[in-house]
């Protein structure tokens, strides 16, 4: 159960990787490599001979990194697919028993190579793929949007009751909001995914929040990261006030739901 998703760093056989080349640069290269590589095309030149489009061969270290990176992304994509399917089944099961859905929406994403490299640098981690897979657990992410606060915790309970889902970490920003007013339930889980060569435990971050929490978080993110504008302390205070208003609306809706036995 302690097995982790690992991608082994392979020493290039043709030449040593330049020490000044950062993981960020290499990951971005690997991420873009397949899109940039032209496909072979065949045309008749009138003489019956075939012309094949040629391109410069990639260095051995680039090919090796691209292969490892693609394999790593396959693991995380599979983890997202499997976890999403579980959530959809639990949502349908709950609907059959309660005549309503506890999940409003499910979204997923995989961090870009640039975002991964920035996070590793911020954490002071060695820029290697093996270190990445053993220390960064939010490369694959799922966001679950629920109507009510109680739905958030019920869906989390149902998910964690699955025997092939292991809880790694929980951060409850609903009961203990961040200073800026952010509210959400964050889970890091490992899910068993079976491949042709065996089973792997894939880490996935699951963010669970209400519709109101998601509205505030999404809008606040757009405002905060407007690059050509400066967010003043007064604006931060207003954003925090909006978060508190949304939280109060959540609790009022929850009380109404309980009063009418929803």
Indicate where each model-derived feature is located.
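An acidic, glycine-/histidine-flanked metal-binding catalytic module
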Residues: 45-80, 87-93, 204-262
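Glycine-rich, low-complexity intrinsically disordered segments
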Residues: 73-75, 102-108, 132-133, 145
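Long beta-strand-rich cores associated with HINT superfamily self-processing modules
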Residues: 133, 146-253
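Short, flexible, solvent-exposed loop/turn segments with mixed acidic/basic and small polar residues
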Residues: 127-137
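Generic alpha-helical secondary structure
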Residues: 72, 76, 80, 113, ...
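Terminal, regulation- and interaction-focused segments at domain boundaries
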Residues: 139-146
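Surface-exposed, low-hydrophobicity interaction/linker segments
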Residues: 79-80, 84, 88-125
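Eukaryotic low-complexity, non-globular regulatory regions
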Residues: 2-70
